[in-house]
Amino acid sequence: MERMFTINAEELQARPFVPPTFLVEGLIPQGVSLLCGPSKCGKSWLVLWMAMRICQGLPIWGLKTHPCEVLYLCLEDTFSRLQDRMYRLPDEAPSGLHLCVAAGKLRAGLEEQIESHMAAHPATELIIIDTFQKIRTAHGSGVGVYAGGYEDVSTLKKIADDYGISILLVHHLRKQKDKSDPFNQISGSNGILGAADAAFVMVKERRSQGTVSMFMTGRDLPYQELVLQLTDCVWELLEQKTEDDIRAEEIPEFLHRLVGFLQERREWSGTATQLIEEMGEDESMKYRVVKILGRFQHSFLEPNGIRYATEKTAAARLLMLRRDDSCDSRDGLIAG
């Protein structure tokens, strides 16, 4: 049996590592990424435009690209359809973009075809597979759905890691929507997402809608949300939100008003009803104020110099708020 390799924490901390590399800065990392969206939402337009710009080292949404050759397996299209798309895109057709409309499947010739292409075109650093489903094969009866999806992506990840390249898989979404987590809409098992290095999910509220929301996440990619608009066959960036931006939007306006309320006094104590009345808030807020204060105690109140605690008496539960510009979130305790 092959011995397990380990490294102790002290050695690991001292060892220098090369930072993660990106083909498109902050967008497409080395490894396997998923681009998922509903059918006919413009995914193929997006990846063809990206491929043409990456070949020429042109920026994508203001992000720096690393120029390289690209292999685009457009397995649901024809060469004539691809030609028509390129005519309609504003960029020149680069010679470094190699197009293919028929290829083998995983464990049935695809790996060897990629190896052959890489030998002939070693400057290739991006392979786009459109769509992922077209290269998948059935697994044996002993392989579960999760394991099968994980294995398929892992096979491609090994190729990406061996060559130090990026592979972008175009994939579909389930018809059933999940507004709480758009990544749950990715077609197939969670094993597909679990094995990927990054994932992008395009969501449209209505098919006729001209914009899409793109949700991004990854191992070396911080969560972001983009709003894109298709204009003259090109997806343009309208809005970009980081995780911090999204978190800030979740802060209820009531808390900002509370900060102003406490600027006029060093401390305050009383019931939720009394707080709402003194602040002039809507009466319905009294049913939510305790939950809001508890949820945002460490993430908002303490960074704004407000210490919060509660005390239960025989008559009622009292809320205690005190200004303390030196307060540390590690010291914040709620007395119940």
Where are these regions (language model features)?
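Helical mechanochemical/support elements of P-loop NTPase systems and associated helical scaffolds
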Residues: 78, 82, 106, 110, ...
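Conserved inter-motif catalytic segment of the P-loop NTP-binding fold
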Residues: 2-5, 10, 17-19, 23-24, ...
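Phosphate-binding/switch region of NTP-binding enzymes
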Residues: 19, 34-36, 40, 44-45, ...
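DNA transaction DNA-binding modules
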Residues: 228-336
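Short, conserved catalytic or adaptor-binding loops enriched in Gly and charged residues
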Residues: 87-96, 189-193, 300-301
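Hydrophobic positions on the alpha1 helix immediately C-terminal to the Walker A/P-loop
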Residues: 46, 50
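Post-Walker A helix-loop "phosphate-sensing" segment adjacent to the P-loop in P-loop NTPases
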Residues: 53-67
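Pre-Walker A (Motif I) flank of P-loop NTPase domains
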Residues: 29-33, 68
